């Protein structure tokens, strides 16, 4: 349990939204630094925007946050913002997120891919889902996929699929990867309950995911919880 706490507490992903080179075109957005201390507030802002339909710009902020380390982060963010600035596209994006949150089928995942103009994407569409409902859904990227492949048996999930990855680690958005994500989601939900009970503090599936992400990056071994 202590290793889980250490991993979560040392998670330090920091993003300066001001660095988006199109920030001046979106007053009131892209104007703060996101750290673990205000990450939940950032998630909640996105959730409110989707539920109320008031500001597609919040989705652009989440996109920039996710692809911050990418060399083409500005282009990816601008493409999404241009796409969602069309009212019917923003409406479909909101519907797609709500639908997959209530019914996480592969078909609804494909719908979300299209809705966020990421027909070949995996990590970014799931980032929107995880931000929308962090009490149920974790994120997944190559670091998570690597950890899952190496550790799922240790934690009692050996019969479940691994993510299909390219040589560079990128997750291929196929049915097997989706099935692996559903198992990963179940694991995060299971461990959020165990950690909340054993740590006597609230852990969400998103918190479990962040601990795993940090552990994989720092080569920390996380113990199996009973």
Give the positions of each predicted feature.
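Internal, hydrophobic cores of structured domains that mediate oligomerization or house catalytic pockets
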Residues: 126-131
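An N-terminal alpha-helical hairpin/helix-loop-helix interaction module that forms a charged
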Residues: 1-116, 134-226
